[in-house]
Structure formats: structure tokens, C-alpha cells
């Protein structure tokens, strides 16, 4: 009888843990730093926005995982409100599409790691130097986004996310279309 009671208790605990998912987990050191700075979690501001942090994976321009303990995307409250507004507008125009966040607020020590990768190369124009205060990502005021379908599959934007080259320059769009380096649809 004791064994059955233990099994029932264990099953209850496992079910409760599965039901709560990661909500019961203690925030990481980086997450606590973001929260102390007053940043908000994008997924809580609007759960319909997809998030796939590119620096939590190795398939980025550095070739390594930079966000070792960060899984949530954070933004300054005003930037988060603007992103939520953009998502609502997108849903009005195209209910089948959604915004997908690849990067948002970024700790300065991560910025330093990125800078170390590009320092002294032709690509250093794409990464803010932390010695000069970093960039808008470091203050929760920049967000790297794309569009995705309901399954989270991204739409073709002409270049891969995190592409460090002229095809990604927004001020060169017309020239790049004429040169067939990007499409008009992108």
C-alpha cells in the first residue's frame, strides 16, 4: 500500500511540474539583470510574438552560443509597447503572419564578445563598440525581427538573419534589387 501511495504522490508531483512548465524556475542571473534594469519579457507582453534568440544558438556570426543563460527576449517597456503595437497591426493586415524576435536587449558583456569577433575587420561597422557605450540593443531599445507563419517558419527576407554584408543594408535596397542581389518581395 505504501508503494502505491508513493507512486500516486510521484505521479501527482510530475503532473504538477509538467503543468507549470518553466514558470516555477528561478530566473537566470542575466534575466535578473534585465528585470532589475526595468525591461519586460516580450513573450509576456504579447504571447503571439514568436521568439528564437539567435545568440542562444551557435548558428550566428560568432559561431558560438553567447546567451548561455538567457532564453527570454527583453525590451525597454516603451520599445516592448511599440513591438506589441506592430504585432497587432500585422495581425490586422495578415492574420496568418506574426513577428519573430531574434534579438532584443543584450548585456554589455555579450556586446564585448561580439566586438572582439569583428574588431579590426571589415565587419566592425556592423557591431557597436562597447567602449563607446555599445548600441541600442544594450539599452533594450533595439530588436531584430522577421516575419513568420503560424508554425514559426520564417519568410524569405533576402538575406539570412545576422548577415553582415551590403545586401542587408536598408539604404541600398533599390540598387540591390536592380543588381538581382535581393528580390522585390524581400
Describe the residue ranges of each PLM region.
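Extracytoplasmic cell-surface/polysaccharide-interacting catalytic and binding patches
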Residues: 20-104, 114-117, 121-186
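Segments that shape or occlude catalytic/ligand-binding pockets
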Residues: 107
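Short, well-ordered surface patches within globular domains
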Residues: 110
Amino acid at each position: 500500500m505504501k508503494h502505491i501511495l508513493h507512486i500516486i504522490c510521484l505521479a501527482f508531483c510530475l503532473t504538477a511540474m509538467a503543468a507549470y512548465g518553466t514558470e516555477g524556475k528561478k530566473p537566470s542571473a542575466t534575466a535578473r539583470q534585465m528585470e532589475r534594469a526595468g525591461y519586460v519579457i516580450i513573450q509576456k507582453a504579447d504571447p503571439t510574438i514568436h521568439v528564437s534568440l539567435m545568440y542562444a544558438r551557435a548558428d550566428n556570426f560568432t559561431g558560438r552560443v553567447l546567451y548561455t543563460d538567457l532564453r527570454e527576449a527583453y525590451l525597454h517597456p516603451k520599445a516592448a509597447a511599440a513591438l506589441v503595437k506592430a504585432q497587432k497591426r500585422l495581425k490586422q493586415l495578415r492574420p496568418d503572419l506574426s513577428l519573430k524576435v531574434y534579438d532584443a536587449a543584450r548585456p554589455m558583456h555579450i556586446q564585448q564578445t561580439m566586438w572582439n569577433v569583428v574588431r579590426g575587420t571589415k565587419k566592425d561597422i556592423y557591431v557597436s563598440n562597447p567602449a563607446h557605450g555599445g548600441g541600442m540593443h544594450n539599452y533594450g531599445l533595439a530588436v531584430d525581427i522577421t516575419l513568420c507563419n503560424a508554425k514559426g517558419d520564417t519568410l524569405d527576407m533576402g538575406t539570412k538573419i545576422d548577415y553582415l554584408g551590403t545586401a542587408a543594408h536598408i539604404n541600398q535596397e533599390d540598387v540591390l534589387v536592380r543588381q538581382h542581389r535581393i528580390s522585390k518581395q524581400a
